[in-house]
Amino acid sequence: MEKLSGSLENVVFHNEENGYTVADLDVDGEMVTVVGHMVTVELGTHLTLLGKWTNHLVYGRQFQFEHYRVDLPTTEDGLIQYLSSGLLPGIGPKTAELIVERFGQDTLKILDDDPTRLLEIPGIGKKTLSRMLGAYQDQRDIRKVLIELQEYGVSSKMAMKLYNAYHDQTVAILLEDPYRIVRDIRGVGFKAADQLAEKLGVDRDNSKRIQAGVVQALRECYAQGNTYMNEEELIARAQELLGVDRETVEMGIRDTIISGAAHMDEIDGRRIYYPMGLYEAEDATALMMTQLAGSHFEADDIDVEEAIDRYESHIAITLDEEQRNAIKTAVKQGLVIITGGPGTGKTTIINGILNILQSMRLSVQLAAPTGRAAKRMTETTGEEAKTLHRLLEYHYDDNALTPTFERNADNPLELNALIVDEASMIDIVLMKSLLEAIEEGTRLILVGDADQLPSVGPGNVLSDLIESGIAPVVRLKRIYRQSEKSQISVNAKAINEGSVPRIDNQSDFVLIPEKNQEGIEKTVLDLLGYRLKDNAGIDVVHDVQVISPVKKGLVGTIALNQKIQNILNPASPRKNEHTFGPVVFREGDKVMQIRNNYQMKWRDALTFEEGDGVYNGDIGTVKSISDDKRQLTVAFTDGREAVYGFDQLDELAHAFAMTVHKSQGSEFPVVIMPLIGGSPLFLNRKLLYTGVTRAKQMMILVGRPEHFIRMIQSDDSRKRKTGLVFRIARYRNLSL
């Protein structure tokens, strides 16, 4: 690495939370832009940086540093500049001159060893001295920690995270157990902790290392959608991570269970292992669902029938027996599940339940897992629907590694009924939090399509609840939302049943044959560029969504987004833009949040409500980009606006094209979906069905017909490893 030394003259940008800094350094009279992570930034400070020179596409030549050191001044002029830099509150240039004039080269020694002598300086009283010494002590602690960490080869970015977590105890804590950073610091994984431990001289067979490796292996459940791992799977993965023998891993598993970080259970004679958080979520969900399902409400059949008749008159539609039964069940049961595909009348039933419960003078709340789904629910019911996070009043807790909600068992929701749409998207952790906030005597109505892809997070909650038999399940099979020429709902139903639908390309369901990915790409871009523009009533910018089965490749979302951006939102002198790595963000771009950020502040543009949290899958538009402030503002579809520092843009991706998984919970007037070959584990019926059911007015598939047929015939989607059905059965047996 190269070395650069100079005086900090200007701070262009500094993020207080993660330390990301862009600044100007005076190096022998030449101003140099430096980029990296610093704990504090005080003008006039002399720094030595270790890093490399880079060329930014927009900002030119920069020095990107990984390590830095604060060089204490050695000259009297340097001491005056250092003391008056803003580092010490109450000390300006004149007072700094008096201090240095009095103590000279011994100034810093006086500050360290005999600070009360500063009272000899006119203008410095006891209060000023106390404030000044507190700040100086903080800076001294920071310098000491940074120097020690850099001796172990820790980068400035990691040092910033560590210091923010442990302050002056950082080094002592790391020497005792470097692996605790995986538990304590959000976003730090086993690999980073293991690298740090190696630099600190921790043995490979150290018990804390082995336990951390076991926990890391179990944590992979979160990414894979499972809630537990089989014994052999856990042992093999832990061995791969740790590079130790089986016996050592088995001992580590026992120690991890004893420590309370993992839980062992048996299902059908097989040992299974949970991360403790997922075990607690699954077990609590099973118990609370069992209790909720045991609730029944007195309601006169004649009164309910009459209420349904009044609702029919109000909407001028005659409900069939299936729909009437769904409404009656929801009114009388503590827990009911309503499942069905597109066009099967779920919205009509939600409105019916809402209408009748409100006519009984009951308080009813509507909710959905995502902002897009909640907005759609609001539009179709005329009543406010909230995201589950907003309903549960999420708040950011810097010390919590999982979401923290104000609404819980101690502060429950004050409702008589809660109707949740798109319930297939709810993972086991969020379901547990939701159930904890529901008071005894509240009806819970879960509505969704169990045949879609399961939640992004761990669990397969809706399908597991249906399989468990814990509550009445109303299965909607008849298609109602269907015009004479529409084939979307009919074909989706056929796909879900494993039948190949008839496609005549004369309706709203089209398959355009293309033999290879080059042809698919060209057709998709042509559709957006000019072919769909001739179709009356279609706005290609707002109405059309490209949904791809994959991220990578010629027709994956990454490549398509770049090319679609140039068609739908080309560069213009009137639009600001910012380059982040290989990605150009431009005002007017359609973007998506790609990971949960529980700390991100937002403000509603209409109500001025403020809150914390932007979530994986939230979609919006780049409203503005400011190079001066080094920030980008996103206006989300539900009215919230959030400001991203340029260093946070790795949390955003373009959403002109999105994966099928990311499209869940949304509907679009027109959907274009490339069809490609691949493993049936991923390219299967469930994925195709989920993609097709996103379209409301037109579904366009592009690719080889045989790939379409193969996906329909492939029901080889990997079943998630979950224990909810087993645990519900256990609690039901206990209650008998």
Question: PLM features: residue spans?
Answer:
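Accessory, non-ATPase domains that flank or precede helicase/AAA+ motor cores in DNA-metabolism machines
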Residues: 1-303
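A generic structural signal for residues embedded in beta-strands
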Residues: 11, 49, 593, 622-625, ...
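Conserved pre-motif I regulatory segment
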Residues: 306-334
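ASCE P-loop NTPase helicase motor core
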Residues: 324-327, 332-506
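Conserved helicase motor core of P-loop NTPases
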Residues: 450-612
